[in-house]
A protein has these predicted regions:
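Surface-exposed loop/interface segments of Gram-negative outer-membrane beta-barrel transport/assembly proteins
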Residues: 13-106, 124-246, 273-280, 295-316
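Short, flexible loop/turn motifs enriched in small residues
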Residues: 243-247, 254-259
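Active-site beta-loop-alpha junctions of metal-dependent nucleic acid enzymes
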Residues: 269-271
Length: 316
C-alpha cells in the first residue's frame, strides 16, 4: 500500500486604524493519495492468505504472483493453495493487481474581520469555506476471484467521484460594559448561515468475459467505463444533496457586584429540512434562562484549600 499527503498553509493577520480594525485571513490546501489501505475482513485483505499459507511451502514460489497463460494471452494469478472457501488470493496479487486508489484534493479558506466601534462595543464577521474533490477507483485484474468481480474472469473496474462543499458565515455584535462599580453587562447578538452540498457519480461493473452474460467478451484489464458490461451487473449511480441552516441568536448577562448574575439566551434556526410544503413549522426557537451567585464573594473567610464557590441554576 502507499500513502502520500502534502499540506500547504498560509495565514496573515493585519491591524488597521490604530488597531481598531483587525483582519485575519488563512488558506490551506491538502493533496492526498493512497493505495490499498488496510482492509478488514477477508476480501482484499492480503493478511488472510499470508496467515494460512502452509509453512512447509516455499514462500518464494508465490512471490511471482502471476504467470503467463498462453490460452488467454495474458498474465493470470498464481495461487496454488486455492481459495479454501475463504475467498483467499495470493497476497502479492491483492497488493499489485487488486488496486484501490484514492485521490483527494481539499482546500480551505477563512477570513475574519473585527472592528472596535467603542471600547465596550465590537462588531465582527467570519467566513469559512471547505471544499474537497475525491476520486476513488477500483481495478481488479483478470483472474481475480470472481466473487469480487461480479462473476467475470476478465476483471472489474469502478470509479466514484465525489464533491463536498461547505460554507459558513456569521456576524456578531459584542457588548461588554460596566455601569458604576456595581453593575456589569455582557451581551452579544448575531446571525449565521451554514450551507453544505454533496454530489457523487459512481460507475462500477465487470468487464464482460462472454460467460456471465450474452455480451461478447471485451478486452481484459482495460479499465474504462466504455469497457464495462451493459447489464444490471454494472451499477451506475448519481446522487447528491444540499442542506442549509440560517440562524439568529442573542445572549445577555447582567451582573451585580461581581457576585450575582442573571443570564438570558435565545436562538432561532431555519433549517432547509423544514422548508417543505408538508412541514408543520419552518423554524424552531430554543431559549434559556439562568441565575448564579458566587458564594465565595459572600463568605468572609474562605478555607485555604477552597478559593472559589459558585452556585448556578438554569432552565432551557
Amino acid at each position: 500500500n502507499g500513502y502520500d499527503r502534502y499540506n500547504f498553509t498560509f495565514r496573515n493577520t493585519t491591524s488597521f486604524l490604530g488597531d481598531k480594525l483587525k483582519l485575519d485571513v488563512g488558506a490551506s490546501y491538502v493533496m492526498q493519495k493512497d493505495r490499498n489501505m488496510t482492509n478488514q475482513g477477508t476480501y482484499n485483505n492480503p493478511l488472510v492468505g499470508a496467515y494460512v499459507y502452509p509453512r512447509g511451502n516455499d514462500w518464494a514460489d508465490i512471490e511471482m504472483y502471476e504467470r503467463y497463460d498462453p490460452a488467454r494471452r495474458l498474465y493470470t494469478q498464481y495461487w496454488p493453495v486455492g481459495d479454501a472457501g475463504m475467498t483467499m488470493q495470493n497476497p502479492y496479487w491483492i497488493n499489485y493487481r487488486n488496486l484501490r486508489e484514492n485521490n483527494k484534493d481539499r482546500y480551505m479558506l477563512n477570513a475574519a474581520l473585527s472592528y472596535d466601534v467603542l471600547d465596550w462595543l465590537n462588531v465582527s464577521g467570519r467566513l469559512r469555506i471547505d471544499n474537497s474533490n475525491n476520486d476513488y477507483t477500483e481495478k481488479f485484474y483478470a483472474s481475480t476471484f470472481t466473487q469480487l468481480t461480479e462473476g467475470s474472469k476478465n476483471g472489474l473496474y469502478g470509479i466514484t467521484k465525489t464533491k463536498d462543499k461547505q460554507v459558513y458565515g456569521d456576524v456578531l455584535v459584542n457588548i461588554n460594559k460596566t455601569f458604576g462599580e456595581d453593575w456589569s453587562l455582557q451581551a452579544n447578538a448575531g446571525a449565521s448561515i451554514s450551507d453544505m452540498r454533496y454530489d457523487a457519480m459512481k460507475v462500477r461493473g465487470p468487464i464482460p468475459d462472454g460467460e456471465i452474460t450474452d455480451e461478447k467478451p471485451l478486452l481484459a484489464n482495460v479499465f474504462s467505463v466504455q469497457n464495462l458490461s451493459n447489464t444490471s451487473k454494472t451499477k451506475r449511480l448519481q446522487e447528491g444533496w444540499r442542506e442549509q441552516t440560517q440562524s439568529i441568536f442573542a445572549s445577555v448577562e447582567i451582573g451585580f457586584k461581581n457576585t450575582y448574575f442573571l443570564t438570558l439566551t435565545g436562538r432561532n434556526d431555519w433549517p432547509s429540512q423544514l422548508a417543505g410544503e408538508h412541514s408543520v413549522k419552518s423554524s424552531f426557537f430554543y431559549p434559556s434562562v439562568g441565575a448564579s451567585v458566587v458564594l465565595s464573594q459572600l463568605i468572609p473567610e474562605m478555607p485555604k484549600n477552597l478559593s472559589y464557590v459558585k452556585l448556578r441554576a438554569s432552565y432551557a
